[in-house]
């Protein structure tokens, strides 16, 4: 149970324990604990509180304040008739603490470096998401021949309404007046589409949105108003037009970038679908983040915008399809550059494997979104069922993710 959502440190001497039981099955629960080196001779006892319930389970929770963080522990469960000990041996009517070194639960040692860090400003963050093309046109004299979408038209990926970064800068006071203090922008880099998730140059702002200097101006002006800017990192895939993929298309295995992508064969053959892509989009080849050179290239992009543009963090597109190893290196580089830069993953499902402190600070909370839609919009839930669903979502993650760093909890986003 150590290093799980049922046993985790929240500081260098505080350990949170949770126990899940069948709903309404248990009268009370306590935990018997001590340093794992002396628990055989003496134990401390601390009651656990039933803090959450969902449709199937009750969740008992307690926080241990420790002087020795090398902890062994056993649960003591009272169901109203019988009493049991719960250890790695399962439920037993008796427990021999003197022989418990083999089977008590443990948190071996709280290494301070392993305690998930907090991004303090996220606790008071209210986000305003902007799909840049659809927001506001602020560059009065730019070429507009590409604009082929009127307000209210049904869009496609290649219809353009003309929004740009200048338009956002002009509306910062309006956004702040709504109570928002963080702006999350969908991708702004060079791309054929309106959504810009098919990036062909990560170092160039798309000309439809303005210039690199316009991004500088937006971030600087926002910071002057105590607002923050978070950009969208598309590191799962790119555009077929990016230089590296074009080189592979031309040279096949002779390209130095061949292993930057995942290609099944000696050369790219779009007709045979022989390379990995995002979704069903042939024009978005998937990066091979397991390749050291490709990973270094992408991580350097993230660091560049933190240093050169002073952005406040990254939202990670399709983050659950990218390797854990890549995200660990990504986090090291980002946090070395700026400890308070936020890292938010686009994970639609249970994301605990990314939220253990070595990868993301939080996620875009689509499970919360779905629960709210089912209750408020579609009338699928009773209030009790809605509460059950929210409690189940909370119990997926640690307290730092739920309360201290806070995920991006939204009712709608550009994908929903």
What residue spans do the PLM features occupy?
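The feature marks proteins involved in alpha-glucan
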Residues: 1-16, 38-127, 137-155, 159
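Aromatic/hydrophobic beta-strand junction motif of beta-rich domains
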Residues: 17-21
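Beta-strand-rich binding/interaction modules
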Residues: 26-36
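Substrate-binding/active-site clefts of carbohydrate-active enzymes
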Residues: 125-127, 131-181, 188-309, 330-336, ...
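Hydrophobic faces of well-ordered beta-strands that scaffold small-molecule active sites
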Residues: 126-128, 183, 229-231, 314, ...
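Active-site-proximal helices and loops of the catalytic beta/alpha 8
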Residues: 219, 223, 245-249, 303, ...
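Conserved small/polar residues in nucleotide/adenosyl-binding loops
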Residues: 409-416
């Amino acid at each position: 149970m150590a290093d799980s959502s049922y046993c985790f440190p929240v500081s260098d001497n505080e350990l949170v324990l949770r126990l899940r039981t069948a709903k309404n099955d248990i009268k009370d629960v306590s935990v018997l604990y001590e340093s794992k080196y002396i628990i055989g001779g003496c134990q401390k006892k601390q009651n656990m509180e039933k803090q959450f319930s969902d449709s199937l389970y009750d969740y008992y929770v307690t926080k241990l304040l420790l002087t020795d963080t090398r902890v062994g522990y056993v649960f003591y469960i009272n169901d109203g008739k019988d009493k049991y000990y719960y250890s790695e041996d399962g439920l037993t009517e008796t427990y021999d603490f003197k022989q418990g070194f083999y089977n008590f639960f443990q948190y071996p040692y709280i290494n301070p470096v392993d305690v998930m860090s907090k991004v303090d400003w996220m606790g008071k963050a209210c986000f305003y998401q902007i799909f840049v093309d659809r927001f506001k046109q602020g560059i009065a004299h730019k070429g507009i021949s590409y604009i082929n979408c009127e307000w209210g038209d049904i869009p496609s990926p290649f219809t353009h309404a003309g929004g740009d970064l200048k338009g956002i800068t002009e509306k910062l006071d309006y956004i702040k007046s709504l109570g928002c203090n963080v702006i999350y922008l969908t991708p702004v880099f060079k791309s054929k589409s309106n959504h810009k998730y098919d990036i062909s140059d990560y170092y160039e702002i798309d000309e439809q949105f303005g210039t690199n200097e316009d991004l500088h101006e937006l971030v600087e002006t926002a910071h002057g108003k105590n607002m923050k800017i978070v950009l969208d990192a598309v590191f799962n895939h790119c555009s077929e037009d990016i230089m590296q993929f074009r080189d592979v298309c031309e040279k096949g295995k002779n390209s130095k970038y061949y292993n930057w992508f995942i290609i099944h064969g000696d050369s790219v053959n779009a007709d045979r679908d022989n390379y990995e892509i995002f979704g069903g989009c042939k024009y978005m080849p998937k990066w091979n983040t397991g390749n050291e050179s490709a990973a270094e290239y992408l991580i350097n992009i993230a660091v560049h915008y933190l240093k050169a543009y002073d952005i406040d963090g990254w939202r990670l597109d399709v983050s659950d399809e990218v390797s854990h190893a890549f995200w660990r290196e990504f986090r090291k580089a980002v946090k070395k550059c700026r400890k308070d830069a936020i890292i938010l993953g686009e994970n639609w499902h249970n994301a605990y494997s990314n939220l253990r402190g070595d990868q993301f600070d939080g996620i875009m909370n689509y499970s919360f979104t779905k629960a709210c839609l089912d209750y408020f919009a579609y009338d699928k839930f009773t209030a009790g069922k809605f509460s059950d669903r929210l409690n189940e979502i909370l119990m997926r993650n640690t307290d730092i993710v739920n309360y201290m760093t806070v995920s991006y909890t939204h009712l709608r986003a550009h994908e929903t």
